[in-house]
């Protein structure tokens, strides 16, 4: 029995038609692991940063018609919410598991907070080759950093700083069949390795 990881069939919850039926599938196949990951990594971030982190598992409570295309657990230092703060995420679309750190368009003091990515521009470029950026958390698209020109990357960061709807995340994504999802041990190691790369951007 695995506690934290996801099997390829779990991702098929996103193929279930209808809001109620999909929510039922998410509750059965995905949310239990998200809650477990929430407990594990809120302790991880608290120990790594010295600040108290809280897990926020997506509830999708505002939805009345369209079923969610993704779901996640987010980590932030506010018990009541995460969107207003820089935060970490573990989440899923139908075809990927993603891990991210960054700032949503709803963040308070977004322009100031997003400047960490401007200051640490070289560090972003020096992330390993399989690291990506996400410029819209609602969409699965996450281009590899290595495929972006300096100007592309600078423009993306400036958009997060200057445009109301702009956001910027550094990210990593794997497919449902990835070997790092085969066991809890491999999955947790992958997540810890990823968050270790993200943490300098949080503490900067």
Swiss-Prot record:
Coiled coil: none annotated. It comes from the Bacteria. Pfam families: DUF1054 (PF06335). Belongs to the UPF0637 family. This is UPF0637 protein SAB0972c. InterPro entries: UPF0637, UPF0637_domain_sf. Signal peptide: none annotated.
């Amino acid at each position: 029995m695995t506690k934290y990881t996801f099997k390829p069939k779990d991702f098929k919850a996103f193929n279930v038609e209808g809001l109620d039926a999909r929510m039922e599938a998410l509750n059965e196949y995905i949310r239990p692991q998200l809650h477990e990951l929430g407990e594990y990594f809120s302790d991880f971030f608290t120990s790594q940063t010295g600040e108290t982190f809280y897990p926020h598992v997506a509830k999708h409570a505002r939805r009345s018609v369209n079923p969610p295309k993704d779901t996640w657990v987010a980590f932030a230092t506010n018990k009541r919410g995460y969107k207003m703060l820089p935060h970490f995420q573990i989440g899923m679309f139908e075809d990927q598991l993603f891990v991210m750190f960054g700032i949503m368009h709803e963040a308070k003091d977004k322009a100031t907070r997003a400047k960490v990515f401007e200051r640490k521009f070289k560090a972003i470029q020096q992330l390993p080759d399989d690291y990506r950026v996400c410029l819209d958390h609602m969409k699965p698209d996450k281009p590899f950093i290595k495929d972006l020109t300096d100007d592309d990357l600078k423009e993306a960061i400036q958009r997060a700083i200057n445009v109301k709807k702009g956001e910027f995340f550094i990210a990593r994504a794997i497919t449902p069949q990835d070997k790092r999802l085969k066991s809890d041990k491999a999955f947790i190691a992958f997540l810890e390795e990823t968050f270790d790369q993200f943490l300098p951007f949080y503490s900067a």
